[in-house]
Curated annotation (Swiss-Prot):
Pfam families: TatA_B_E. Part of the twin-arginine translocation (Tat) system that transports large folded proteins containing a characteristic twin-arginine motif in their signal peptide across membranes. TatA could form the protein-conducting channel of the Tat system. This is Sec-independent protein translocase protein TatA. NCBIfam families: PRK01833.1, PRK02958.1, PRK04598.1, tatAE. It is found in: Cell inner membrane. Residues 60-69 have a biased composition (Polar residues). It comes from Vibrio vulnificus (strain CMCP6). Residues 47-59 have a biased composition (Basic and acidic residues). InterPro entries: TatA/B/E, TatA/E. GO terms for molecular function: protein transmembrane transporter activity.
Length: 78
């Protein structure tokens, strides 16, 4: 009995529609939806970047050894 009834919510909704109009409310709704969509997209991109960064890169020594062996193979084939 201290809560808001459905009738009170309905009266508040009617007052809001009368004050702002349906066009403005529709615009606010689409802006809010776009903001939520952009937020979700940014969160997904951040998670994918974390997944990409989880691997451990090869050390410089391993990369230089690999490059040296590849260049030797290229010279032998030529």
């Amino acid at each position: 009995m201290g809560g808001i009834s459905i009738w009170q919510l309905l009266i508040i909704a009617v007052i809001v529609v009368l004050l702002f109009g349906t066009k403005k409310l529709r615009g606010i709704g689409s802006d809010l939806g776009g903001a939520i969509k952009g937020f979700k997209k940014a969160m997904n991109e951040e998670e994918s970047e974390k997944k990409d960064a989880d691997f451990e890169p090869k050390s410089l020594e391993q990369q230089s050894k690999q490059a040296a062996t590849e260049s030797k193979k290229d010279k032998e084939q030529a």
